[in-house]
């Protein structure tokens, strides 16, 4: 590479919620560091972070049934739900810090209070939900969660869903008022604007072409300036790959051994969006159902109130689609280009293992709009086709890797960090709960990649996140205090 390199302390690739969060935290911890951001598109937060490319759920395991499972003895395992909730609590604390320190002006531009509900039908599912509720309310994280199978109560909670339901139907719901709707696109843009004001060099229309580690451990990054039609050469001690579906390709280009034997499978999301404001006005909650038997976790149907640009809207989905692209704006060659000699057996093993997912995707692809409306009518019996339009959401690249528990070619359904042994580069891969846990995940990156600084940074981290290093589930008094301060800062009460 050219010797005429522009040097930075940190390079962030991708201007989505993950890079924006990491950049903001690092600027608070090390204000003198030079940080440079490269984004291929012309604006920040245009891919998975964009408000129309995700459901905007503040994932806190308040309503998502796939975070709780029934054990063989009939008891309910809520460990995963506790973990997800704790992670979202970290995000709430950090966002409150930003508001209290005037780094964000109006929290309601990106977060709104909204009840989170779980809804089930059928005797067995009602029994499961009741047991789940009884287990969860014993934990302080889920205090205030209500259960009801009384039709009159449910009509008050979810009038649109309860209208014209057959008498005597087995139906039940839980409701908790501490849920949120989060506009991650708006939040991303606010954080990036803040970084620019703090002299972070944010470059749009810049595509990273190659990464190579130099003999001193730093990274040399070749970047194509799409506006100026020229190549630029940059170097940094640390590089973060926060390019959504594009992170896998960049991880492979880095050549680090930790990036071997990892593949990706792209799944696109479709939603039905209500175009009738009168209908949207009748619903005020995020209501999550139960995935059908044999369906993957990402197929959980939900009916969501959304707040976008101060307007209330209503979405139902997701329905799965398939495109070989790893990004909405990506190439049809993305999937094929990601197949390498080191991951081909991993991908083939997943293909054999995941026949159920393949069958599910084929079935989803063949659905007509009217068949999708029939699924919506399981939630809203009176739904009219003319009131709903199909919209295409973002691409999600599910990670496929070899694991001890699952063996070769195991499909992962979460968010994970892959980092080099020397901590000089890290990549964020995967999907849900994603953006909701961005602060927790970026602190994980910082702990993995900057261990030599953690001691000097600890006091500042605790100022930003008072529960840092502690379990709120095990510290109910601290939880109460933090809930009160974050509710006030974020105007959630």
Curated annotation (Swiss-Prot):
Top-rank taxon: Bacteria
Protein name according to UniProt: Probable malate:quinone oxidoreductase
EC supergroup of this enzyme: oxidoreductase
SUPFAM superfamilies assigned to the protein according to its UniProt record, in alphabetical order: FAD/NAD(P)-binding domain (SSF51905)
Alphabetized UniProt keyword annotations: FAD, Flavoprotein, Oxidoreductase, Tricarboxylic acid cycle
Cited Gene3D superfamilies: D-Amino Acid Oxidase, subunit A, domain 2, FAD/NAD(P)-binding domain
Entry EC no(s): 1.1.5.4
GO biological process: tricarboxylic acid cycle
Catalytic activity: (S)-malate + a quinone = a quinol + oxaloacetate
Organism per entry: Lysinibacillus sphaericus (strain C3-41)
Gene: mqo
UniProt family annotation: Belongs to the MQO family.
Pathway(s) this gene product operates in, as recorded in its UniProt entry: Carbohydrate metabolism; tricarboxylic acid cycle; oxaloacetate from (S)-malate (quinone route): step 1/1
Keyword Cell division: no
């Amino acid at each position: 590479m050219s010797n005429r390199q522009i040097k930075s302390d940190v390079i962030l690739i991708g201007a989505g919620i993950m890079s924006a969060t990491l950049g903001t935290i690092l600027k608070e911890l090390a204000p003198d560091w030079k940080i440079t951001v490269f984004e291929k598109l012309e604006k920040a937060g245009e891919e998975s972070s964009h408000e129309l490319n995700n459901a905007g759920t503040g994932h806190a395991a308040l309503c998502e049934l796939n975070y709780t499972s029934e054990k063989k003895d009939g008891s309910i395992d809520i460990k995963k739900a506790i973990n997800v909730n704790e992670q979202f609590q970290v995000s709430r604390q950090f966002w409150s810090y930003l508001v209290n320190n005037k780094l964000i002006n109006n929290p309601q531009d990106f977060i709104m209070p909204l009840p989170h509900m779980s809804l089930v039908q059928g005797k067995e599912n009602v029994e499961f939900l009741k047991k789940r509720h009884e287990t969860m309310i014993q934990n302080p994280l889920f205090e205030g969660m209500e259960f009801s199978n009384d039709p009159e109560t449910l009509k008050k909670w979810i009038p649109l869903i309860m209208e014209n339901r057959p008498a005597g139907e087995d139906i039940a719901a839980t409701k908790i008022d501490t849920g949120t709707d989060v506009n991650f696109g708006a939040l991303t843009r606010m954080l990036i604007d803040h970084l620019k004001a703090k002299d972070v060099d944010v470059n749009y229309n810049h595509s990273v072409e190659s990464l190579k580690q130099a003999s001193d451990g730093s990274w040399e990054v070749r970047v194509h300036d799409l506006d100026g039609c020229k190549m630029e050469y940059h170097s940094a001690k640390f590089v973060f790959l926060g390019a959504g579906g594009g992170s896998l390709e960049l991880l492979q280009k880095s050549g680090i051994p930790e990036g071997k034997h990892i593949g990706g499978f792209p799944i696109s999301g479709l939603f039905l969006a209500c175009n009738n404001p009168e209908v949207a006005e009748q619903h005020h909650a995020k209501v999550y159902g139960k995935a059908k038997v044999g369906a993957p976790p990402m197929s959980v149907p939900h009916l969501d109130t959304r707040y976008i640009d101060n307007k209330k809207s209503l979405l139902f989905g997701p329905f799965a689609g398939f495109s070989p692209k790893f990004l909405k704006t990506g190439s049809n060659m993305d999937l094929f280009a990601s197949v390498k000699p080191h991951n081909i057996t991993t991908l083939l093993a997943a293909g054999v293992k995941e026949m159920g997912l393949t069958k599910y995707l084929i079935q989803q692809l063949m659905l007509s709009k009217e068949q999708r409306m029939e699924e919506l009518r399981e939630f809203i019996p009176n739904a009219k086709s003319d009131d709903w339009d199909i919209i295409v959401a973002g691409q999600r690249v599910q990670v496929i890797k070899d694991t001890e528990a699952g063996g070769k070619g195991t499909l992962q359904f979460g968010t994970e960090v892959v980092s080099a042994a020397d901590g000089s580069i890290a990549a964020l891969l995967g999907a849900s709960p994603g953006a909701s846990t961005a602060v927790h995940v970026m602190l994980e990156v910082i702990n993995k990649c900057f261990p030599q600084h953690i001691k000097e940074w600890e006091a500042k981290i605790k100022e930003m996140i008072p529960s840092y290093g502690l379990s709120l589930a095990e510290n109910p008094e601290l939880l109460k205090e933090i809930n009160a301060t974050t509710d006030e800062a974020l105007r959630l009460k």
